[in-house]
């Protein structure tokens, strides 16, 4: 158990108050920069600062996290160079989730696979896309592209769109992963519209859910509402749950406008505290090991 103080990118992180399972994995992180090396997309909706592989390794080594998944961030569009170079630096401890489009070739997908990519992300929420027909079309297209590689589809979307895709998902052999609690709002409780569909899809074994970035879905990530929602999910299907920090925590600040041409500060999230909160939600060493180590090993082919 680590008791040393840890500060990364000027953000302090609490020491762990539980025994971290061996081969634990942070299933949702991003790497940005160096900014001089990787051009941003002209269609980005924010400008990130640098958050480099050495910073990520300092965080994970300090928190005893042995494995990591780099999710390609939206400001780079479909230019995956920054993420792929990060995977090359990480070696066998890293896996990746890319963002592609119709111009991405099969040869490029094969090359991504060799450096550790195991899925692609559909960033619907980032682009403000809530059209169910469009989402279904994208899901079918993406499945056709990645199924031959054995990859999964990761979707950033909300409960309503997720529910509209239920029939499509039930026809797929490709695993579907929803990140950030599928944007279920903690304060609306477990009876909120479409939460029952999320539970049903988890029960079917066709989808996975990331218990990531609770600050995105709760006014108080430590509060009773967030705890109730998380524990409901954990009790329901722990073998389909993953944990991710969302480091370095992009996403803007509530009430503050976003600027494409001005560096946006990352949210100062305490990831040690987030892990301790997860351990308190679970309160069972075997289930915690399943969420932090066993499940990621299966999904990401570690």
Please place each PLM-identified region on the residue numbering.
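Conserved, mostly hydrophobic/aromatic
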Residues: 28, 60, 83, 112, ...
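Hydrophobic faces of well-ordered beta-strands that scaffold small-molecule active sites
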Residues: 24-29, 68-71, 94-98, 120-122, ...
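Glycine-rich phosphate-binding "P-loop"
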Residues: 39-50, 67-71, 113, 118-134, ...
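A generic "structured core" feature
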Residues: 25, 29-31, 138, 142, ...
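Alpha-helical scaffolding within the catalytic cores
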Residues: 52-56, 104-107, 162-163, 190-198
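An N-terminally biased module of ancient metal coordination in phosphate/nucleic-acid-related enzymes
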Residues: 1-78, 261
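Active-site gating/metal-coordination segments in enzymes
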Residues: 3-12, 77-160, 167-169, 208-219, ...
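H/E-rich (His + Asp/Glu) clusters that bind or coordinate divalent metals
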Residues: 4-11, 192-302
